[in-house]
C-alpha cells in the first residue's frame, strides 16, 4: 500500500491551520481471513505530529478525519458463495467498542456487481493517537487467494481544536453492470466519481479537499465518462439532490463562452437558408390545396 503525499508542508496551512489531503491506497488485495489496513501509516503519523505541533503550536493537535470511500471489485467468478464484512475500527477503544457505530457494511463478491462504500468518520483524534483502521472479514468465501480488490479514498485535516460533526450511517452504492464492463473499472474513473461524492455528500461546514492534492483534479467535460447504473450519493439536510449532469455542468470549459458569438455567426447563414426552404415548402403545400372561404366573407348569405 502506498500513500501519495507531495509534501509534508501540505498537511497544514499556517494561516488557519486547516488543510485536507486526499490519499489513495493502491492494489489493496483482500484475502481469506481478516484483512486490516490503517488509514494513516505510522511513519507518516509521526511526521504529521511533529509538524502539526510545531506549526499549530499546541500540545494536543486534533486529527479530524472526513468521509471515507471504498471501491470494491471482485476477483472471483460470479456465483461464488460467501460475503465480506467491512467495518470501520477505532483501535483506541477496547473490545466491542472498537467498531464505530453505524459504520459497518456487507458485500457479496459473487454477485457480479462492484460497489462503492461511503463511511462517515467525522471523528476527532489527537495526532499521536492510533489512526482508524479498515477491517474486511471473509465470511464463507471458499478461496485462499485474493477475492477482491479495494481502493480507499479518505481525507483528514489538522486543527488546534476539536470539531464535532453529526455522523451518518454508512451507505453502499451497487453498480448494475459487471466489474470488467463498468465505466468505473479503472482508477481514474473511480477517482472522478469519488471526487464527485466528496463534493456533494458533505455536510455544511465540513472541510473541503484542497487543490494541492493530486486526487483533487477534475477532468475536462470531454474526458468525464458517463456513470451508468449509479445512484447519486445522498446529501444530508434539506439540500436539493445533485446529479452527475449537474456536476458536469460546473466544469464546462470557459472557452465555450468566448466561442459563443462565433458559433452564432457561423450558423446564421445555414439557419436562414433552412428557414427559406421551410417557407417555400409551406407555400407549395398550401398552393395545391384550394382555399375554402367562409360564406360570410363572400357575401353569399341570403337576406330575409
UniProtKB/Swiss-Prot annotation:
Q: Which InterPro entries match?
A: MPV (IPR000603)
According to the UniProt entry, where is the signal peptide? none
List all Low complexity biased stretches.
Answer: 264-277
Keyword terms of this UniProt record? Host-virus interaction, Inhibition of host innate immune response by virus, Suppressor of RNA silencing, Transport, Viral immunoevasion, Viral movement protein
According to its UniProt entry, the protein's GO biological process terms are: symbiont-mediated suppression of host innate immune response; transport of virus in host, cell to cell
Biased amino acid composition, Basic residues: 278-295
Segments of this protein annotated with the region Disordered: 257-304
* Function (record text): Cell-to-cell movement and long-distance transport of the viral infection. Also acts as a suppressor of RNA-mediated gene silencing, also known as post-transcriptional gene silencing (PTGS), a mechanism of plant viral defense that limits the accumulation of viral RNAs.
Q: What is this protein called?
A: Movement protein
State the organism of origin.
Carnation ringspot virus (isolate Lommel) (CRSV)
Amino acid at each position: 500500500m502506498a500513500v501519495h503525499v507531495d509534501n509534508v508542508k501540505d498537511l497544514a496551512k499556517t494561516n488557519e491551520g486547516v488543510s485536507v489531503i486526499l490519499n489513495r491506497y493502491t492494489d489493496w488485495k483482500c484475502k481469506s481471513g481478516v484483512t486490516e489496513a490503517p488509514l494513516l501509516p505510522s511513519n507518516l503519523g509521526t511526521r504529521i505530529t511533529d509538524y502539526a505541533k510545531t506549526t499549530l503550536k499546541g500540545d494536543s493537535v486534533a486529527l479530524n478525519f472526513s468521509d471515507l470511500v471504498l471501491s470494491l471489485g471482485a476477483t472471483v467468478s460470479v456465483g461464488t458463495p460467501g460475503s465480506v464484512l467491512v467495518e470501520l475500527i477505532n483501535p483506541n477503544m477496547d473490545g466491542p467498542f472498537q467498531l464505530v457505530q453505524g459504520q459497518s457494511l456487507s458485500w457479496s463478491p459473487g454477485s457480479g456487481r462492484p460497489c462503492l462504500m461511503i463511511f462517515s468518520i467525522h471523528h476527532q483524534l489527537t495526532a499521536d493517537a492510533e489512526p482508524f483502521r479498515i477491517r474486511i472479514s471473509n465470511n464463507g468465501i471458499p478461496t485462499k487467494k485474493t477475492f477482491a480488490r479495494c481502493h480507499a479514498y479518505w481525507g483528514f485535516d489538522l486543527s488546534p481544536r476539536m470539531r464535532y460533526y453529526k455522523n451518518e450511517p454508512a451507505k453502499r452504492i451497487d453498480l448494475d453492470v459487471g466489474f470488467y464492463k463498468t465505466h468505473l473499472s479503472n482508477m481514474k474513473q473511480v477517482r472522478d466519481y469519488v471526487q464527485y461524492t466528496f463534493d456533494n455528500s458533505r455536510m455544511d461546514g465540513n472541510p473541503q479537499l484542497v487543490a494541492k492534492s493530486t486526487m483533487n483534479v477534475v477532468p475536462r467535460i470531454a474526458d468525464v465518462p458517463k456513470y451508468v447504473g449509479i445512484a447519486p450519493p445522498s446529501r444530508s439536510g434539506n439540500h436539493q439532490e445533485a446529479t452527475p449532469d449537474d456536476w458536469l455542468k460546473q466544469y464546462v470549459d470557459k472557452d465555450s463562452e468566448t466561442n459563443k458569438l462565433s458559433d452564432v455567426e457561423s450558423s446564421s447563414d445555414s439557419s436562414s437558408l433552412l428557414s427559406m426552404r421551410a417557407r417555400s415548402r409551406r407555400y407549395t403545400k398550401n398552393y395545391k390545396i384550394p382555399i375554402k372561404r367562409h360564406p360570410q366573407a363572400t357575401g353569399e348569405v341570403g337576406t330575409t
